[in-house]
Amino acid sequence: MGSTLLLKDAQNETYFKSWYQKLLAALQFCSGKALSDEFSKEKKLIKILGDIGEKVKSASDPQRQEVLKKEIGRLEEFFQCIKTCHLPLNPALCIKGIDRDACSYFTSHALPLKITFINANPMGKNISIIFKAGDDLRQDMLVLQIIQVMDNIWLQEGLDMQMIIYRCLSTGKGQGLVQMVPDAITLAKIHRHSGLIGPLKENTIKKWFSQHNHLKADYEKVCLAAANFK
């Protein structure tokens, strides 16, 4: 799905337009009806997310949450119509609806959306993703692919960095989907817990790890991973 969206978007490129058109035509020819129908559903889902993102960004700050709640209704209507859809960010996952109460937006400059889908697998957990508009996620995709390659090399050499490499998919120029890592904590938040001069202290992160990894084996695993980065 991601490749078809990028190829369609790339048809506006001046120098390689004809090549992208040929690649897209070949992909669509080989896909068959069932896969083409799935591509159409995912494309419509991305279009709705893009429209919601634009409306949330254009709304005044006090009205943004209300606008988001209203626009989430479009996603609910979408799933009522198509029943299920594969998640473009991870085609192995199938989604069947929206957890309205778990949806929100982040207050950073680009105002990305946090969207939580209901897993079509009754045994699976709900799936949260970030929809970003205004950033070129093609660069993020490249960096994450390089990190994945490096992590494979490190593991082959016996260096386990305890890496969690999240998924990222550019769905067009300046927009895309990012996997939300459960229970992730930013360095900024860790530093804030240590007070004003927290970022200047050498043991800030080590102390935080110690507080949140009570088992000796877990703490040693974290320390070993940190040491492997040096």
Model-identified regions with their sequence ranges:
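Cytosolic small-GTPase signaling regions in large eukaryotic proteins
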Residues: 1-105, 109-112, 117
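Conserved ATP-binding subdomain of kinase catalytic cores across diverse folds
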Residues: 73-229
